A protein has these predicted regions:
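Register position in tetratricopeptide repeats
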Residues: 51-52, 85-86, 118, 122-126, ...
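Start-of-helix register in tetratricopeptide repeats
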Residues: 40, 74, 107-110, 114, ...
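Canonical positions in the second alpha-helix
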Residues: 64-65, 98-99, 138-139, 172-173
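Canonical tetratricopeptide repeat
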Residues: 44, 78, 111-118, 152, ...
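C-terminal motif of bacterial Sec signal peptides marking the signal peptidase cleavage site
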Residues: 14-17
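Short coil turns that delineate tetratricopeptide repeat
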Residues: 36, 70, 104, 144, ...
């Protein structure tokens, strides 16, 4: 009888422990789901701020999102856009690199190339040629020498009165393209005038 009582007591203790384990697993699962929901809400909020061009608020929301869910790839992309909008170009690239290192999501690796292109376009549109030149050089590293990036880079050098580099860039581009020929002629004339003055 005593053995039977010990066996029953042991069974009750084991069943109680199993119930506690299931409860703790449920608590962890619920916490993860709540964290995921909160991260999704922060992502949506940050994306909305990007759309409204409130980049500082977007950066704040998206950083919190990534803190809650470091594997949330889309948040890294939106955060990069917010950094570009806030004219924090190096941070835009850095966050994509960190996101790729953390998640190994190839879309983040590809987005780094798009980020360079976007930064180049923003800087040339804003006529910030001094800042644009290093980014345009990175773009040529990514895409190779193309008519478009050669014209952009030559324009940036010309606007900085660096006609020698403008001519050099255009000489490396496709000489059969009419726009390159025209730009090269203009750059040579401007360089000659610059040297003469």
């Amino acid at each position: 009888m005593r053995k039977w009582f010990l066996i029953m007591a042991t069974a009750v203790v084991l069943c109680s422990a199993c119930g506690k384990k299931d409860a703790s697993v449920n608590d962890v699962t619920q916490a993860a789901q709540a964290s995921s929901t909160e991260a999704e809400n922060l992502y949506k909020e940050g994306s909305q701020y990007v759309g409204e061009e409130d980049y500082e608020s977007a950066i704040e929301s998206l950083l919190k999102c990534i803190e809650l869910d470091p594997d949330y790839s889309k948040a890294y992309i939106q955060l990069s856009k917010a950094y570009i909008g806030n004219e924090e170009y190096d941070e835009a690239m850095t966050i994509l690199q960190q996101g790729y290192e953390k998640t190994k999501d190839t879309s983040l690796e590809k987005e780094q190339d798009n980020c360079v292109r976007t930064i180049c376009q923003v800087l040339t549109d804003n006529e910030d040629y001094e800042t644009a030149i290093p980014w345009l050089l990175k773009l040529q590293e990514l895409d190779g020498v193309t008519v478009e990036n050669s014209l952009q880079l030559a324009e940036a050098y010309s606007m900085m009165d660096d006609y020698e580099n403008a001519v050099s860039v255009l000489q490396k581009a496709d000489q059969n393209d009419a726009s390159i020929k025209n730009a090269l002629l203009e750059a040579r004339v401007a360089y000659g005038q610059y040297c003469y003055d």
